[in-house]
């Protein structure tokens, strides 16, 4: 790793199944886990721009990893804009082709807002899950966001567009947005249907059979019946047409995946509104364990689990359940401020890295 966040240069060999990165807050533990997640998924949940990821003295950041002893992955971020991805020394024309060998599931203290936070947080979580299962999904999200921006720009320029051209412009947008929206809705719906029984089982276990969890997908378009693409596409086109007057008044699109909501129901009550803080944290834990299980099941191998300062936010009982659930199956990288809370067995079987040494040494084993 070169020129990434607060790291000028770092070479780290992660040999054990359990890895503990220990050190005070603000020293760069989260940056290390973020770099691994970025290389595995091409996304950072902590930064909106690559500019935020590049060391302030550098013009580029370079991430490299060897996964499964065979796959060499590289991602270069440039301050002037643009990325370059390489796999086994070959420059990739599509960044998405980097995804696969280093699948990760991240769980940080920020994820604890998943239940009580805004709908956008649940959409982003669901999108990360779908992308792990179908890397091409990122293209759909990018296409939809671009169409949404262009449509908003169209409304801002509406008065300057000749009247005879307006309907044809909107018709063209409706066709494209309906198609992309349908494909996003279908993938989100399928992913939630797969996640729900797993999350429900984990919630039942974590609550000692006291709580029943349901995941209720509420698409931002009015959709009925089976997930067939053509009926859903036509339904969305019809809704976009019917909403034009309202859309013109508001200057924004009211139909589509950007309006989706995922309701999390505990014993048929909305966890966001009626769940206690402890119940909400249990729901997040159940969702993350379900995600970990689903990605491993559908992708054929257990993903790397990144636990970023999250154990300190869980009570001892939930900490123990999480660490037991991870077991020996997953390689797990955990950041924490201290070793308290980790069982002696976990510490003895873990590679322990002092975070304070990372910036002073080029190579840590």
Curated annotation (Swiss-Prot):
Alphabetic keyword roster: ATP-binding, Cytoplasm, DNA damage, DNA repair, DNA replication, DNA-binding, Nucleotide-binding, SOS response
InterPro entries: DNA-binding_RecF, DNA-binding_RecF_CS, P-loop_NTPase, RecF/RecN/SMC_N, RecF_2
Xref: HAMAP family: RecF
One Gene Ontology molecular-function label: single-stranded DNA binding
Protein's cellular compartments: Cytoplasm
Species: Prochlorococcus marinus (strain MIT 9313)
Pfam family membership, one: SMC_N
Gene3D superfamilies: P-loop containing nucleotide triphosphate hydrolases, RecF/RecN/SMC, N-terminal domain
Functional note: The RecF protein is involved in DNA metabolism; it is required for DNA replication and normal SOS inducibility. RecF binds preferentially to single-stranded, linear DNA. It also seems to bind ATP.
NCBIfam families the record matches: recf
Source taxon at top rank: Bacteria
Binding annotation for ATP: 23-30
Xref: PROSITE patterns: RECF_1 (PS00617), RECF_2 (PS00618)
GO biological process terms, semicolon-separated: DNA replication; DNA synthesis involved in DNA repair; double-strand break repair; SOS response
Family according to the record: Belongs to the RecF family.
Chief site of localization: cytoplasm
GO cellular component: cytoplasm
Protein name: DNA replication and repair protein RecF
